[in-house]
Each structure stands twice: as structure tokens, then as C-alpha cells.
């Protein structure tokens, strides 16, 4: 399996986090190397959006009710909007790569770190996308998310329902997930249909069929300062 880590070139925090990530993968003896994927940076957001004919369609303040999806779009705390868009574009480009090579890939953000060796083949599951990250410290309502997963006997299960039906409910952050070509094509279709949202909002159970998580967690977040919120 190919694995890619999104790294902001020249950003000391991101570069150091990537080293921690790769070291952790070696320590758990994963059977793959992690390729560095240069993140889109705020300076290149406009050109990248234009090149791929993408429009941003998510509020910066307050909330909006999306009539097309029935979902409520709540603004994220974002001091630099283009940093938020750049993050989403980095994931978008990896979705395109997955669709192009037509095989599953592991997508990692620089702040992920491995705690367990990946010991399963995603092709043994019918899920399109599988999150492998421990939710504790990584997502809102993290304890509810964790408890719901632990209460389910399935080793790979659908993303848990932990909130109102109109709140996008996805993975425990997007710091670590395996995506199949079917999942990548679905994400690209959603961007074309609804515009680009924050990647962890668009990748939600309400819009993506077969969006799953593992009961055994293979990664956790390093607990670093956000490079998108600040």
C-alpha cells in the first residue's frame, strides 16, 4: 500500500512532525514507507483552485443550511481562510492521485503518529474509506465517538452517529485514513457537485457511503498547534 504524508515545506513544526510520524511507523514495523506529499500552501490556493476548476462553498462565519444536502454548515475557527482551503486542496489532490493509480492509499497528515502496526488489508472490507485514528483528543465529542466504536463488535464499522442528523459526521479528524478508488471518486464527485468544503466536513457519513472506522486504533494525533486554524 502506498502511504502519503501531507507536509508543509519549510514549516518547522510540520517538518518536525513528519519526522516523528516516520519514526513511529518504523518503530511499529509497518510494511510500507511513507512518501512525503508537499502540501498546498496559502500562496498557491487561487492557482490550484483555478487549475482544477474548484469553487469554495463553505461559510467563514456563522452557519448555513445547505439545501442540496440538508446539512448544516458551521463555520470553523479560521484566522487564515486560505490555510483552511489549502488543507482541503491537499487532501483533494491525494484523492485525485488515488483515483488515477486505481489502488488504495493511506493518507496521513503530518501530526499523525503510529501506535500499532497496520495488520489488515483494506480490500477485505467493503468500506470505501476507513479511518484508523484514535478519536480521543482528535475530534469533537471524542468520548462519545470512542465509546460508540467500542460498543460495536465489528472490527471495521460505519462511522458512529454522535450528533444531530444535519451535522456532518465523519472520521475522527482526517489525520489518518485509507481510501479506495471508489471512495476517492466519490469525494471528487462531491466536490464537483457541492464545491469544496473543509475535508473533514465533506467526508461525512451523510454524503459518503461505506465510510468506516477501525475498532482497533493504529494512529493518534501528536497534539501539535494547528496549522489551519491559526
Functional labels for PLM-detected ranges:
Residues 1-108, 112-230:
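An acidic/histidine-cluster motif and surrounding catalytic segment
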Amino acid at each position: 500500500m502506498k502511504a502519503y504524508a501531507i507536509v508543509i515545506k519549510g514549516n518547522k513544526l510540520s517538518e518536525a512532525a513528519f519526522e516523528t510520524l516516520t519514526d513511529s511507523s518504523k518503530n511499529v514495523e509497518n510494511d510500507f514507507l511513507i512518501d512525503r506529499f508537499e502540501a498546498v500552501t496559502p500562496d498557491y490556493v487561487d492557482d490550484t483552485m483555478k487549475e482544477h476548476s474548484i469553487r469554495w462553498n463553505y461559510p467563514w462565519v456563522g452557519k448555513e443550511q445547505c439545501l442540496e444536502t440538508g446539512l448544516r454548515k458551521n463555520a470553523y475557527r479560521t484566522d487564515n481562510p486560505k490555510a483552511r482551503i489549502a488543507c482541503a486542496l491537499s487532501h483533494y489532490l491525494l484523492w485525485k492521485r488515488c483515483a488515477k493509480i486505481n489502488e488504495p492509499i493511506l493518507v496521513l497528515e503530518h501530526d499523525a503518529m503510529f501506535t500499532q502496526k497496520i495488520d489488515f488489508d483494506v480490500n477485505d472490507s467493503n468500506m470505501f474509506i476507513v479511518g484508523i485514528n484514535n478519536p480521543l483528543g482528535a475530534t469533537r465529542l471524542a468520548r462519545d465517538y470512542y465509546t460508540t466504536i467500542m460498543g460495536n463488535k465489528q472490527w471495521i464499522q460505519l462511522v458512529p452517529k454522535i450528533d444531530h442528523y444535519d451535522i456532518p459526521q465523519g472520521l475522527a479528524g482526517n489525520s489518518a485514513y485509507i481510501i479506495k478508488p471508489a471512495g476517492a471518486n466519490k469525494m471528487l464527485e462531491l466536490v464537483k457537485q457541492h464545491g469544496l468544503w473543509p475535508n473533514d466536513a465533506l467526508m461525512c457519513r451523510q454524503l459518503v457511503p461505506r465510510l468506516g472506522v477501525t475498532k482497533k486504533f493504529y494512529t493518534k494525533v501528536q497534539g501539535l498547534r494547528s496549522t489551519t486554524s491559526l
